């Protein structure tokens, strides 16, 4: 009887550690360069949408419309919390709160991260503000430059 209870507790502890490890991995994966999905950009009338999430979670947004006008190009300190792992889908949800209010994005929104597809969705109350894909080349280049700067 006690051995079954202990086995269940050990299994539960392993599950909690596994979920925590996956969420930490997702938080690290979140950092880097993200660019707008071409279909989403076309539907929303944008030429480009870039998001760079720096370690420490400062977000750099660059949004350009089809006429080449910069709608938003700014550095925004963001607080990223509430990591939630969806068990039936490989999606992580991060709650984001920006320090300032901006015209094109709400003060609070969610990052829905699908690390299997490298896709990030910015949404708030089922309104999608952006669909982005991870730019691994730009992310790796940024980390290399950052490492070079800190060494010299």
Curated annotation (Swiss-Prot):
One GO location term (cellular component): virion component
Subcellular location: Virion
Keywords recorded for this protein, A-Z: Signal, Virion
Signal peptide as annotated in the record: 1-23
Main subcellular localisation: virion
Family classification: Belongs to the asfivirus EP152R family.
Protein name: Uncharacterized protein EP152R
Organism: African swine fever virus (strain Badajoz 1971 Vero-adapted) (Ba71V)
């Amino acid at each position: 009887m006690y051995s079954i209870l202990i086995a269940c507790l050990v299994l539960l502890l392993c599950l909690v550690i596994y979920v925590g490890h996956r969420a930490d991995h997702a938080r690290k994966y979140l950092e880097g360069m993200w660019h707008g999905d071409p279909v989403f950009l076309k539907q929303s009338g944008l030429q480009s949408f870039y998001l760079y999430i720096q370690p420490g979670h400062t977000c750099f947004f660059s949004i350009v419309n089809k006429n080449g006008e910069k709608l938003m190009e700014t550095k925004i300190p963001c607080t990223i919390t509430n990591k939630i792992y969806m068990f039936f889908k490989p999606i992580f949800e991060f709650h984001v709160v920006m320090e300032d209010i901006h015209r094109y994005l709400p003060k609070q929104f969610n990052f829905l991260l699908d690390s299997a597809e490298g896709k990030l969705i910015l949404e708030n109350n089922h309104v999608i503000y952006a669909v982005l894909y991870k730019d691994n080349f730009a992310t790796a280049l940024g980390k290399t430059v950052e490492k070079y700067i800190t060494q010299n």
